[in-house]
Design a protein with these regions (language model features):
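Conserved catalytic-core segment of nucleotide-activated headgroup transferases in glycan assembly
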Residues: 36-48, 145-214, 280-282, 317-323
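A nucleotide-sugar donor-handling region in carbohydrate enzymes
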Residues: 2-17, 119-181, 203-207, 297, ...
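Catalytic binding pocket for nucleotide-activated donors in carbohydrate/polymer assembly enzymes
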Residues: 136, 141, 245-313
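A donor-sugar binding/catalytic signature common to diverse glycosyltransferases
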Residues: 93-102, 226-268
Length: 338
């Protein structure tokens, strides 16, 4: 648990108890850390009574307001909170019921300590294998919920191609400070591809701001500021490293080219093995042209391997994960039933 939990807990807990004496706590809120959390939440919210959104992030507050959502700033003193994080310290009282779920599919980086799950009454994972991994490190509050973020994209939509259109490439990268990113292998070379390909780029929000500034300023590419999931269905090939977006690309059955990334502190060996099996792996940018030719010529070459990986990453890919997660929430908090 982070230090702020212990620092603020006495004051927050006292405030919660006082407010509960004055007016019994009955509200459930959704804590939205980033706009990505909203993408996960909306397919769940439609199966529940309206649940207020709260945040402590200025940019997230501005984003939600700009999209027309009603949102409040922390602190909040609810009966229960739902979140897509392991951020129980934002509500530092044992009296607040806490429900959590993953903000990315599966555990593409080594999981946080089981101690950080202890405040949760329920934490939902994207697949049985993901849950089994959590149990193996000592998590005791887990259930399988699925991955609601994908619901609006299932079944996979068919995107018609414009006649004469260039093939579309989607470059993705996790944050470089993780030691698991491939961004340094391609950022200086994107301009070499723009004549032949349409290029979109998405990077983790924690990526070095200098990289992000450079990408925003580049001519001939589309830098994705929001959810990259919108851009996967019409991509012809996705270029990846070790980010959990790989699971989303896999679910939508798109061919991938991956960089061979050395092991780092938070690497998960079995995930590296899966990535190697579902993608064309390369070491350097010089190998990319040949890999692209192969992926474009035979997009279904690793389709069976992607289907097998989906069984690891996800519970079911039926577009109903939001409904299943909502049922788990209702079992714990029946007052939120529609």
């Amino acid at each position: 648990m982070v230090f702020s939990y212990y620092l603020f807990k006495p004051f927050y807990s006292a405030g919660w108890r006082l407010l509960n004496l004055l007016h019994k706590r009955q509200e459930t809120v959704f804590y939205c850390h980033t706009p990505v959390d909203l993408e996960i939440w909306l397919p769940i919210q439609k199966y529940l009574k309206p649940i207020p959104i709260v945040t402590d992030k200025r940019e997230t507050y501005k984003f939600l307001k700009g999209k027309g959502f009603s949102v409040r700033k922390l602190p909040a003193f609810p009966k229960a909170v739902i979140m897509c994080r392991v951020s129980a310290h934002k509500f530092p009282s044992q009296k607040v019921i806490k429900i959590g779920m993953m903000h990315g599919a599966y555990h593409f980086k080594r999981r946080t300590s089981a101690k950080n799950y202890l405040p949760f009454s329920l934490y939902m994972f994207s697949s049985q294998m993901d849950l089994d991994n959590a149990v193996s490190i000592g998590v005791t509050c887990g259930m399988v919920g699925g991955y609601p973020k994908l619901d609006p994209y299932l079944p996979t939509p068919a995107i018609p191609k414009r006649s004469g259109a260039k093939p579309k490439l989607l470059f993705t990268a996790t944050y470089d400070s993780s030691g698991m990113s491939g961004i340094a292998r391609w950022i200086d070379h994107l301009h070499e591809l723009t004549d032949r390909y349409e290029i979109a780029v998405s990077v983790h929000p924690w990526t070095n701001p200098e990289y992000i500034q450079r990408l925003r300023a580049m001519q001939g590419i589309s830098f994705i500021e929001d959810n990259p999931l919108h851009h996967i269905p019409d991509a012809d090939v996705c270029i990846v490293d070790t980010s959990s977006i790989i699971a989303e690309i896999c679910a939508l059955d798109k061919p991938m080219i991956s960089w061979k990334i050395p092991a780092a502190r938070r690497s998960v060996p079995e995930v590296y093995d899966i990535i190697a099996g579902i993608s064309i792996q390369i070491e350097s940018f010089e190998e990319l042209a040949g890999a692209l030719d192969l992926a474009l010529a035979k997009p279904a070459a690793l389709a069976q391997e992607r289907q097998q990986a989906n069984k690891v990453f996800f519970d079911k890919l039926d577009g109903k994960a939001g409904e299943r997660v909502a049922r788990h929430i209702i079992d714990l908090l029946p007052e939120n039933k529609l």
